[in-house]
């Protein structure tokens, strides 16, 4: 049986010239010459570039099938790897046999025809868009980043923990959660006071899709010392922007016996590790993004890796913004949550490097963040990156039960809803810290693709849950 080879392995020189192999993939283009030859560009998704197959007109099905091949048809090609006389490719496939696996019904109406399509159009055909150069490249980069994240944490001695997607806790205390229910909406059970009786629901209480795996992750960090979660999270935030998704993936490490400084160091090490990985492993895709999407993609990643992170207190960041002379769209004052324009000014113009902003006002941060000695700020941090702004948000967690209880009450939350979280402070509490990295936002940064809807396979946004 002939060896099956990926296009990536052939183009990387892992297949010897003169070897006969079988390539399975799809037609990107077909070009015919007057000399009785056809040139097929075949891709299989294993890398950015297709391989060229040279087809002689003496192949058995040349007239009946080869000359009918169009963009999108699937083929199985067996032939010999030969050196290519053409520029831009070291080798090509001299076809001996071609089987057509699948035809395109109507090439005239095929949504992924060889012409260039707008990114907006591609969202309407999300089931077919991975066949395009841009979305195929995004998918490979996404895979590379995910694998690098897992490798990084494994090498650092972390354990991956699967936290629940269905929860009764609101980690952020923002209330923007999707309710999970099996109740009949046309015949809802009611309490004596007329409220919906969730005790009759599937879980016996009000339940939601998770907004974060952090609280559950903390329980495992307080036993295994170093853990991380990596999975989907959900926000019922009615935001139609290029930065928001209703369903997205989060990376959330949690470290016991750790301070905010330890947290910031972990964030820096992780980001630099995964950026090195993508530069080493996906050069072909990054060159495409550099040429067609954002000319600074590769330079930005290299600069990030070679930069020392600046560190600054929130209060000092506010002073810098006030003294900048910039007319910001959102006015600056102590107590505001920094907007994207503020973050990008700090990272791109003032420091010209990644920045860790820390010790934020407690009133704009979540209940679980450790209260500082000044009583006004919490041990929170945001990592700001040139070109995007906030890329990571984290904190040292509040390990003191009495302080945590006070914060829960201040936020208008119910202590009984967090009984198990409070237990972590009652039984062998330790200082601990962690952060959250929005995985899709990381991909936006790495690829230069502007809209977050284009870096997740099937985006979920307000009034859009197609496919």
Swiss-Prot record:
It catalyses: tRNA(Asn) + L-asparagine + ATP = L-asparaginyl-tRNA(Asn) + AMP + diphosphate + H(+). Keywords: Aminoacyl-tRNA synthetase, ATP-binding, Cytoplasm, Ligase, Nucleotide-binding, Protein biosynthesis. InterPro entries: Aa-tRNA-synt_II, aa-tRNA-synth_II, aa-tRNA-synth_II/BPL/LPL, Asn-tRNA-ligase, Asp/Asn-tRNA-synth_IIb, NA-bd_OB-fold, NA-bd_OB_tRNA. Its EC number is 6.1.1.22. GO terms for molecular function: asparagine-tRNA ligase activity; ATP binding; nucleic acid binding. CDD domains: AsxRS_core, EcAsnRS_like_N. GO terms for cellular component: cytoplasm. It comes from the Bacteria. It is found in: Cytoplasm. The keyword Cell membrane does not apply. GO terms for biological process: asparaginyl-tRNA aminoacylation. The keyword Metal-binding does not apply. HAMAP family: Asn_tRNA_synth. Belongs to the class-II aminoacyl-tRNA synthetase family. PANTHER family: ASPARAGINE--TRNA LIGASE, MITOCHONDRIAL-RELATED, ASPARTYL/LYSYL-TRNA SYNTHETASE. Homodimer. This is Asparagine--tRNA ligase. It comes from Histophilus somni (strain 2336).
